[in-house]
Design a protein with these regions (language model features):
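Conserved beta-sheet core of the metallophosphoesterase superfamily
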Residues: 1-60
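A short C-terminal boundary segment appended to hydrolase-like catalytic domains
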Residues: 56-144
Length: 144
């Protein structure tokens, strides 16, 4: 969070974090010059064959950027309507037939057939929903 604040203060308008392989929260931060900066700390994995349930849940970020040019020539960029659309990497037994679904297109039946259930039988449709709701602020979360 310290690095995100520094990046905002240095002029970033949007910050998208990566690497931890799991979903992490998103928030607005206020830059030193008063701008609102959107930060998504991690979108998780979009496509992977990881073996742990939380590493199979990710998100796609959508947002609108609005650019304004002031009379003095300075340009400002504002972020509008950021949403994290939850994704699920699905694979069959033996990590075969790997594919990614938006959660809104995923079904409880697919979740029951997920290959990760061999090692983690608690993985399922409700688990995915609850995990996303745990990590992502409802202001930004898009499940439907």
């Amino acid at each position: 969070r310290t690095l995100a604040q520094s990046l905002a203060d240095w002029g970033a308008d949007v910050i998208i974090g990566t690497h931890p392989h799991v979903l992490q929260d998103a928030e607005w931060r206020t830059a030193a010059d008063g701008r609102n900066v959107f930060v998504a700390y991690s979108l998780g994995n979009f496509l992977s064959t990881h073996s742990k349930p939380d590493q199979l849940i990710g998100a796609v970020l959508t947002l609108e950027l609005e650019q304004t040019t002031e009379p003095d020539g300075s340009v400002h960029c504002a972020v509008r309507g950021p949403k994290l659309h939850v994704t699920v990497t699905h694979y069959d037994a033996g990590k075969s037939n790997v594919r990614t679904y938006l959660f809104r297109d995923y079904t409880p039946e697919l979740a029951q057939a997920h290959g990760v259930r061999a090692a983690y039988p608690s993985f399922g449709y409700d688990y995915i929903r609850q995990t996303a709701q745990t990590y992502i602020n409802s202001e930004f979360l898009e499940l439907a």
